[in-house]
């Protein structure tokens, strides 16, 4: 990237164009580059890497306080990245930043996350990409998260990332003075103990709300969720490649036949 030119930064999320974290991120990232915001028209949390097939997508301009803010896409976070690259941007951006998500995306939740998926789609398309998430579902304060997103983005623009790799960053929802430090972490293991809540409509037909408790299986500071719970910022390199190479040798010994 030309050091004399401001970087072009694509911003997206999964909480939708009105997401508070997206607006905090945009205000922060404007200080280091030229931004384009492309986000879902509606919240799409938990969509993972879903994309829309068989249904047309629509792009609309979005205004905040009568000023142009960005574009909405009537689809998923991954749709937003694909549409941004093919229909909105004249060329690939220097950086893609997804977030700031309302709620952490650590451990197994990484697989469910539309925020992380948008960044992974960027990496698949050859764009240096980051995902940021704030570990709370209430009383969110995005000020430090937005500040750290800007700081890390500047570093990544200088240093770069390996191919097909993103950084997924999870930040505690506490004042900056209480942050214990920054840790490079692994994706931890966790499991949801599901508890679907049954309700009935006015006709007596049952419907269900998915609910559950996240059970943490890794409890050391080298793992993302535990680190965040101990008031550290967790920076986790995530790869697009899901291959379990440690098991390949054992699998080959099965001598599978056609």
Swiss-Prot record:
Superkingdom assignment: Bacteria
Localisation: Cytoplasm
Keywords, sorted A to Z: Cytoplasm, Hydrolase, Metal-binding, Nucleotide-binding
Reaction it catalyzes: a ribonucleoside 5'-phosphate + H2O = a ribonucleoside + phosphate
Binding-site residues, a divalent metal cation: 14-15, 45, 101
InterPro entries: SurE, SurE-like_Pase/nucleotidase, SurE-like_sf
Cofactor(s) this protein cannot do without: a divalent metal cation
The protein's enzyme class: hydrolase
Main location, first listed in the record: cytoplasm
GO cellular component: a single term: cytoplasm
Note accompanying the cofactor annotation: Binds 1 divalent metal cation per subunit.
E.C. no: 3.1.3.5
NCBIfam families associated with the record: PRK00346.1-4 (NF001490), PRK00346.2-2 (NF001492), PRK13932.1 (NF010542), surE (TIGR00087)
Function: Nucleotidase that shows phosphatase activity on nucleoside 5'-monophosphates.
Similarity comment: family membership: Belongs to the SurE nucleotidase family.
Name by which UniProt lists this protein: 5'-nucleotidase SurE
Highest classification ranks of the organism: Bacteria, Pseudomonadati, Chlorobiota, Chlorobiia, Chlorobiales
Name of the gene: surE
